[in-house]
């Protein structure tokens, strides 16, 4: 009897609905096509390399991974080669020691730039709908440029705002230490104190949580809801936040 094909699916943040959805449909594909999916959480480098060892021990022939750190790419690819396992990167592209994308590893990701552009276009539309004076308005762009997909989204958003006619000199970028609400909140606070002249804020971020962190920071600095527009990317965390 042919033994059942096993494939791993490793994700960096299993608690995030995005990755839960990926796992759910991987399981569905496994049922439909007749293979077993071994799901493992890999929040850091050590757990990632250990997970590849345990996949090999269980007889898996390959794995899909959203790595906790793109710079682990060379180590992941080398380990996979050592076990003669196939590897596909999902969402975040591997980079080599020099920080250059590893094109040798197949990548499946969404159109991050296009999604970012849509965020920027909708922010501009909503600003016009509210009749804000552009001179009193600024963009707070909470960035995580070391993560390729995040950089594509926020750059796409800022490019779309500029293309619509928003002045580049009023787009302020601030890096976040982490892509969650506390990280974005701290980043946004550090920016808000530098620009007391701004009366209206457009908040750009790579996901719902970075945008929520930015919005909460404006709230803490006394801005009211009519003077802040934030558009998240994901449609998950913002939904639960707004239902409170």
Residue positions per predicted region:
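A residue-level marker of the well-folded mature domains of exported/periplasmic proteins
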Residues: 1-244
